[in-house]
Amino acid sequence: MVKEFDQDPQADVWILLDAQASVHYSRPDDIVIPPADRFWLWKNRYEFSLPTDTFEYSVSVAASIASYFLRQGLAVGMMSYGQMSIALPAERGERQQTKILENLAFLKSEGELPMLGLVESQYSHIPRGSIVVMVTPSNHETIALAADALHLRRMKPVIVLIDGVSFGSENGVEYLSLTLTERQFPVSVVKKGMDLRQALERGFIEEPARSQVVN
């Protein structure tokens, strides 16, 4: 996927994070990372273990992607809809990194809006030519429709799928991954226990913020 960014190194990067409650899975008895601690760990790029929770993985992936591209000097924006709506315009610099990490740290997977709804409600605010990274554990076919919608509007969709089966859920993403690949969209699949740095290296970034490992 790195070629997607090499083609236009000045393109804005937009991260769309799926915070719809019904698509996420967590193990109730696992550890919980307080929001303030999560922000501090991300900001200082410390390694830490993630719980068995697809949303924790999703926000950590989003944080790693945002931090990486901001360090490369690109403008990064973010959109999500959990217990609150987040719509951060694409900007550069450390201040933008702080805003993104703060919002991610306190975001909860309590939303009702699916990824397709997020895309349809927000793509008018995203400039053509932008790279749009969708981070989701959903295996619904509407993810492919969301990618199609972005592509038709001359944006460059990239999809990071969090594989729920590896967390104990019944919702695997293998079929959706194949569908997206057949449509020639860049896809990265993240599973529980993966080092996020390695998982994303196989996708589209070469050196994200030092990633979290779950044993």
Give the location of each predicted region:
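Exposed, interaction-prone extracellular/peripheral surfaces
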Residues: 1-215
